[in-house]
Amino acid sequence: MTLDLDAHKKDDKLLITTIQQEYKILAEYKMIESEKLSGIYVIPSYANSLQWFGVFFGRQGLYAESVFRFTILLPDRFPDDKSLPSIIFQQDVIHPHVCPYTHSLDVSHAFPEWRCGEDHLWQLLKYLQVIFSDPLDSIRGIEVDKLKNSEAAELLMNNKEEYVARVQENIKESKEHIFDTPPTEDPHYIVFEKFQQDVHGPVLERIKAGRSKLTEPSAQQANGGHATGLSWVKEGEFKPLSIE
C-alpha cells in the first residue's frame, strides 16, 4: 500500500510539473505573438510542445527574398534548464553562425546559457533576424575560429562576391522547395499553397482594403479549434498574405 501511495505521489508530481511547463511554453508563444517579429513565423508542434516549426522570410540585406524553414528544439526541462534551445535549418544556409554540417544556428555568443525568467524565445528569434540582416556586424569582435562556419566568415570578410553568390544559391534552393509535401503529418506544420484566385483572392482583396478582421471563420475554427498551420503565398512571390 505504501509503495502504491508513493507511486501515485510521483505521478501527481510529474503531472503538475508537466502542466506548469506547458503553461510556461504557452506564455513564451504569447510573448512572440505580442512582439510581432517581421518575417518570422513559428508555432509549437501539435504533438510535442518542445518542438516548434518556423519559417524565416529574409526582408533585407544579403538574405532578402530567402524563405528558410527551421525547427526549434527546447530542452526537456525548458525553461528551467540552463541548456540553450536549438534552432536547426532544414536546408543548407551559408552563414558564419550556422554549422555547415548540422545546419544548427549557434546562439551561444548572445546567450551563453539560458536564464529562466530573463531570456525568452522571442529574443532568440530577434537574434536570428538581426544576424541575417547584417551578418558582418554579427561577427565583429569574435575570433574566426570560434565561429560555427569559419569558411563562411572568411568569405564574408575577404571575398564578398563569392559569399553573395553562395547565399543566392541558398535562396534559390529555398524557393524551389517552399511548396514541397510536408515531411510530417503534424497539423501545425507550416504549409504554403500556390496562389489560387478563387480561394485566396477574397482574402487578398480584404487585406488590400485594410480590413484587419475577416468575417469568415478562421482556419483554426474551421478545423475544430486546432490551427492547421496553413498559409498562402501569392503566385510569383514568396510573401505570406498578411497585413504586415
UniProtKB/Swiss-Prot annotation:
Organism name: Drosophila melanogaster
Q: Which Pfam families match?
A: UQ_con (PF00179)
- What sequence ranges are listed for the domain UBC core? 20-176
Please give the InterPro entries that the UniProt record associates with this protein. Answer: Ub_conjugating_enzyme, UBQ-conjugat_E2_core, UBQ-conjugating_enzyme/RWD
Job description of the protein = Required for efficient DNA replication, probably through involvement in telomere replication. May have a role in telomere capping of heterochromatic chromosome ends.
Compartments reported by the entry:
Nucleus, Nucleolus; Chromosome
Name the source's superkingdom: Eukaryota
Q: Which GO terms describe its cellular component?
A: chromosome; nucleolus
> In the UniProt record for this chain, what is stated about the effect of gene disruption?
Embryonic lethal. Hypomorphic mutants are late larval/pupal lethal and display frequent telomeric fusions in larval mitotic brain cells. Unlike other telomeric fusion mutants these fusion events preferentially occur between heterochromatin-associated telomeres.
Q: In the UniProt record, what gene is named as encoding this protein?
A: peo
Q: Which UniProt keywords apply?
A: Chromosome, DNA replication, Nucleus
Q: Which GO terms describe its biological process?
A: defense response to bacterium; DNA replication; sperm individualization
Q: Which SUPFAM superfamilies match?
A: UBC-like
Q: What is the similarity comment for this entry? A: Belongs to the ubiquitin-conjugating enzyme family. FTS subfamily.
Protein's name according to its UniProt entry = Protein pendolino
Subunit architecture: Interacts (via N-terminus) with cav/HOAP (via N-terminus); the interaction is direct. Probably interacts (via N-terminus and UBC domain) with ver and moi.
PROSITE patterns in the record, alphabetically?
UBC_2 (PS50127)
Q: What is the lineage of its organism?
A: Eukaryota, Metazoa, Ecdysozoa, Arthropoda, Hexapoda
Signal peptide range equals none
State any further remark. Answer: Multiple telomeric fusions result in multicentric linear chromosomes that resemble little trains of chromosomes, hence the name 'pendolino', the name of an Italian train.
Primary localization class, coarse: nucleus
